[in-house]
Amino acid sequence: MNFETVIGLEVHVELKTNSKIFSSAPAHFGAEPNTNTTVVDLGMPGVLPVLNKRAVEFGMKAAMAINCEIAEHTKFDRKNYFYPDNPKAYQISQFDKPIGEHGWIEIEVGGKKKKIGITRLHLEEDAGKNTHTSHGYSLVDINRQGTPLIEIVSEPDIRSAEEAYAYLEKLKSIIQYTGVSDVKMEEGSMRCDANISIRPIGQEEFGVKTELKNLNSFNNVRKGIEYEEKRQAEVLKSGGIIEQETRRFEEATGKTSLMRIKEGSDDYRYFPEPDLVDLFIDDAWKERIRAEIPELPDKRQIRYINDLGLPAYDAMVLTLTKEMSDFFEATLAAGADAKQASNWLMGEVSAYLNAEQKELHETGLTPENLAGMIKLIEAGTISSKIAKKVFRELAQNGGDAEQLVKDKGLVQISDEGALRTIISEILDNNEQSIVDFKNGKDRAVGFLVGQVMKATKGQANPPMVNKLLLEEMNKR
């Protein structure tokens, strides 16, 4: 029996506000444990929450960016559960009246585009963080408690691990462009749970789903889904049944393990938050927030293709992160050719960032010095080979490309007289290569070009070397 996989993703994104959603405590990552907290976060008797307007506006902006309808009337609810990192024993969330509904984003997998529906986007507060020690006790940090979150719930439209990966990449890119979050999974500002079920191909009814947690990277989302597909298929083929449960992805083994039997919404005993009034969003407020949304990646891609003449693949890669796309645009503004700038950013720059595990702003590279280097290549001042050395120096230490080339003596040798002298000396010392060339062995030319480049430390103008080398050999 062959099965079809059905996947829905729940993505939590921390909003980049200065303070928490219901208290005045700072909402910044990385502080000492239990320093970013107030009596509201600790759930002390008699304290009242105050809604952070900026968090609401960030939620509206994110919802609009993923094509959600914004609610005119929304409210907050209490989600009741007990856990050490939840001092109040309830979480303030949204249940039946979320701030955004009925959205979608478009993904592309294997050259095919597909719309993935968004059921809802709602606001809520984050919980604290437990750290389990090897001494039999746990440490609780309340810093994260009360940090504003949006939860984005997809429709069960995803059919493979690859589609899930593409959805997360696209969602991260869109949220990043809006500026409402850093969406850094390594810092916990973007987290994902996956609901996975399988059903016989052709069956309309959904199978029993399992919820998968502890997915701390896009790769782990993919691996977790792939494992769970196989596990559920093996259970059904052996005559077993799938239980509705929550499972943990174990990164060390690549497998999933049981955490708990899955709760339903009734288990949380939702009821309206009595300490917060309902929220009404009028058209004027919506339009003001909509006007703040910048150009999003899909529109930017189209502009790069139509206005700059870039291939679709280049446009997609350049717009995947806002930092890269903004850097590209600033490089063009500094005078660089669009295709050359694209090639450098997608090639040498991306390779350097991956190898060094850095982001652009953490290097010495600027749009101005990258554009300056590209202009030196176009002017013939430096070769592409020398440009790679210049790039690494700029990336590591910054500075001006033209001044660096002068200081390091890296100017390309394009003087015909100087090159002829060098070529003549090399030909005098490699007479057999001349014989080989005249006998039709083209490899001899490559060898001699290499000797010239070696003698000039890679600074000779390659096209000119080829031209002069052929001229000099034909004279002999």
From Swiss-Prot:
GO annotation (BP), single: translation
InterPro entries: Asn/Gln-tRNA_amidoTrfase_suB/E, Asn/Gln-tRNA_Trfase_suB/E_cat, Asn/Gln_amidotransferase, Asn/Gln_tRNA_amidoTrase-B-like, GatB, GatB_C_1, GatB_Yqey_C_2, Gln-tRNA_amidoTrfase_suB_CS
Keyword set includes Protein biosynthesis: yes
Enzyme Commission number(s) of this protein: 6.3.5.-
Record flagged with keyword Nucleotide-binding: yes
SUPFAM superfamilies (UniProt xref): GatB/YqeY motif, Glutamine synthetase/guanido kinase
Catalytic activity from the UniProt record: L-glutamyl-tRNA(Gln) + L-glutamine + ATP + H2O = L-glutaminyl-tRNA(Gln) + L-glutamate + ADP + phosphate + H(+); L-aspartyl-tRNA(Asn) + L-glutamine + ATP + H2O = L-asparaginyl-tRNA(Asn) + L-glutamate + ADP + phosphate + 2 H(+)
Family according to the record: Belongs to the GatB/GatE family. GatB subfamily.
HAMAP family in the record: GatB (MF_00121)
Subunit note: Heterotrimer of A, B and C subunits.
Name recorded for this polypeptide: Aspartyl/glutamyl-tRNA(Asn/Gln) amidotransferase subunit B
Species this protein is from: Listeria monocytogenes serotype 4a (strain HCC23)
